[in-house]
């Protein structure tokens, strides 16, 4: 691919969610005078590729990550690069050093002078001086050098100048620009208020971890003002943000820190004005007209988009998101949904192959690894099958397919095991490998297969879990709800903790004394699932209880009073939103 790109006079390659392990390919690009910018989030190996630039939050300086949030998704890294390029093209502040200055009283007669130095809206330096008026000149402080050749912005310049004159004397002239009038005009809610007052009413100050002062308020206002004034956050950025949110959910990244912010802001953008490609897919999936949340994106949208890649035609999903012509987008959306149906059929067929093999191999791999391989398993089904094996056996799982003499494997973790332990013990056998502690993959020459099996048997003996197997079946309850709390207002609580996903599971409740007033069954060919109506007093709740048909008339029956553990969700039927309980466990009182 690199040679083909060079033959077409390409000069720059930007990777997305890959590249950190592609040392040979990037070396070839260098030989062909092609620059490579790597954007990735996978763990780097000991040797980094010789790329023009590497952007990866998992790169360390010694034992410490350089970037403050190493779990950023690959699509999040790419989104940040796209946003930075857009800022460079549109902003007058690109590359320009700026200082923000504020003064405030300290204890006694002293004053605090605090300042931030910014470049590209990011803090690159900060300085704080505490001075008693008349005890020092400006040349006795570090301020002169800090302010040298800098554009200085302040809030209420007249007040700041009076304070500085009081500290250093009236002979010192500070050349500063007052942003209070401009920001106040752009954001009427802050007009006429001091930084001290704004700090008192700031949500950021209220929920900040650690100190949050007046200068922090000024910095946040400045960034928001520049974004608004220069119209940096328009449809184009919103559409990119939506894709970053969907990608972060699809990649099963932990929902905290920046991932949570990206998903939350991205979902808000989706519900405000959806990306055209997503909108066409959402329409064909029957989701149009409803407010989308993380659950719909995770369960109904992400698998469909991913299906094209599973079926070896990832370019179709990419084209849907790039296509400008509405008719062509409609055709592509229909094609992707057809591939998703094909993927489901393939997954069911491959499961009948992989499950017996993994079961047979359990003892061989010390009961610590679910491992299946077959010439009949297509490469596109390895990931989804490994995921299903992991869930089924509550063990780390590996599924391998073979094609043209190459073994391709997908691994999924369970019970807190870090997959790097297996991969590193076999690394010299691989053509390439990479991933996370909980999802990874590799490719390998089939000639190394016997050596790999031997290594894997040894590695499996060393697997240790951070969570016992029983924990996988334990239900953790977030709150016990009195029956009076089971009303539609409960969604205000549930939505407060959105978005849900990895490391932020949906809220699980316990309620006692519910009466079963109706029982039905779901399914035409099989009646495995149960639908219930539960009486909570003022409100009657529709409920589903999956795989519970055999429990009817055994563990509970009509008119029983029960205690239930459940989630509360929204179900859509014929265009109407219906609150619904999803039962996880139920016991007769």
Question: What is the predicted role of each segment?
Answer:
Residues 105-133, 264-303, 307-351, 391, ...:
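Acidic, two-metal ion nucleic-acid-processing modules in DNA metabolism proteins
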Residues 128-188, 215, 221-222:
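Conserved DEDDh/DEDDy metal-dependent 3′-5′ exonuclease domain
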Residues 22, 43-47, 61-63, 180-185, ...:
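Short gly/pro/ser/thr-enriched loop/turn and capping motifs at secondary-structure boundaries
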Residues 1-48, 54-56, 60, 130-156, ...:
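N-terminal small/polar loop signature for handling phosphorylated ligands or for N-terminal nucleophile
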Residues 175, 183, 202, 398-413:
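Short glycine-cluster motifs
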Residues 361-387:
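Flexible, glycine/threonine-enriched loop-and-boundary segments that flank and lead into catalytic domains
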Residues 50-122, 180-359:
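A structured phosphate/pyrophosphate-recognition subdomain
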């Amino acid at each position: 691919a690199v040679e083909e790109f060079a033959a077409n006079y390409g000069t720059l390659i930007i990777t997305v969610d890959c590249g950190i392990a592609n040392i040979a390919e990037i070396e070839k690009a260098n030989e062909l005078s092609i620059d490579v910018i790597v954007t990735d989030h996978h763990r780097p190996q000991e040797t980094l590729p010789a790329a023009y630039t590497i952007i990866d939050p998992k790169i360390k300086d010694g034992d410490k990550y350089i970037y403050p949030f190493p779990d950023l998704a690959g699509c999040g890294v790419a989104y940040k690069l796209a946003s930075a390029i857009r800022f460079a093209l549109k902003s007058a502040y690109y590359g320009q050093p700026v200082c923000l200055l504020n003064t405030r009283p300290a204890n006694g007669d002293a004053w605090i002078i605090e300042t931030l130095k910014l470049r590209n809206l990011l803090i690159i330096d900060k300085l704080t001086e505490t001075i008693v008026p008349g005890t020092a000149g400006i040349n006795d402080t570090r301020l002169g050098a800090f302010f040298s050749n800098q554009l200085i912005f302040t809030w209420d310049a007249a007040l700041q100048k009076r304070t500085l004159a009081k500290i250093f004397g009236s002979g010192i002239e500070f050349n500063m620009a007052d942003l209070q009038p401009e920001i106040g005009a752009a954001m009427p809610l802050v007009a006429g208020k001091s930084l001290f007052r704004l700090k008192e009413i700031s949500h950021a100050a209220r929920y900040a971890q650690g100190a949050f002062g007046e200068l922090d308020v000024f910095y946040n206002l400045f960034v928001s003002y520049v974004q608004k004034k220069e119209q940096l956050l328009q449809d184009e950025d919103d559409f990119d943000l939506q894709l970053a949110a969907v990608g972060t959910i699809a990649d099963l990244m932990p929902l905290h820190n920046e991932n949570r912010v990206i998903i939350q802001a991205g979902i808000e953008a989706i519900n405000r004005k959806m990306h055209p490609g997503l909108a066409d897919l959402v329409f064909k999936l029957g989701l149009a007209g409803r407010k989308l949340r993380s659950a719909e994106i995770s369960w109904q949208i992400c698998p469909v988009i991913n299906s094209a890649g599973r079926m070896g035609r990832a370019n179709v999903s990419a084209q849907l998101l790039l296509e400008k012509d509405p008719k062509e987008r409609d055709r592509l959306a229909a094609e992707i949904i057809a591939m998703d149906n094909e993927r489901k059929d393939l997954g069911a067929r491959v499961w009948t192959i992989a499950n017996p093999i993994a079961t047979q191999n359990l003892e061989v791999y010390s009961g610590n690894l679910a491992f299946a391989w077959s010439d009949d398993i297509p490469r596109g089904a390895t990931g989804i099958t490994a995921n299903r094996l992991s869930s089924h056996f509550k063990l780390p799982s590996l599924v391998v397919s073979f094609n043209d003499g190459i073994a391709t494997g997908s691994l999924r973790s369970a019970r807190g095991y870090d997959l790097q332990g297996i991969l590193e013990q076999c690394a010299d056998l691989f053509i390439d490998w990479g991933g996370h502690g909980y999802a990874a993959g590799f490719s390998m020459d089939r000639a190394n297969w016997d050596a790999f099996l031997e290594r894997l048997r040894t590695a499996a003996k060393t697997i240790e879990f951070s969570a016992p197997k029983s924990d996988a079946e334990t239900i953790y309850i977030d709150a016990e709800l009195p029956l009076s709390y089971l009303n539609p207002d409960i969604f205000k609580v549930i939505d407060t903790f959105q978005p849900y996903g990895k490391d932020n599971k949906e809220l699980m409740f316990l309620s006692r004394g519910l009466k079963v007033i109706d029982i039905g069954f779901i399914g035409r060919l099989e009646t495995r699932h149960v639908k219930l109506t539960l009486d909570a007093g003022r409100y009657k709740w529709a409920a589903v209880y999956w795989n519970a048909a055999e429990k009817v008339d055994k563990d509970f029956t009509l008119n029983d009073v029960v205690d239930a553990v459940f989630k509360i969700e929204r179900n859509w039927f014929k265009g109407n939103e219906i609150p619904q309980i999803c039962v996880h466990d139920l016991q007769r009182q």
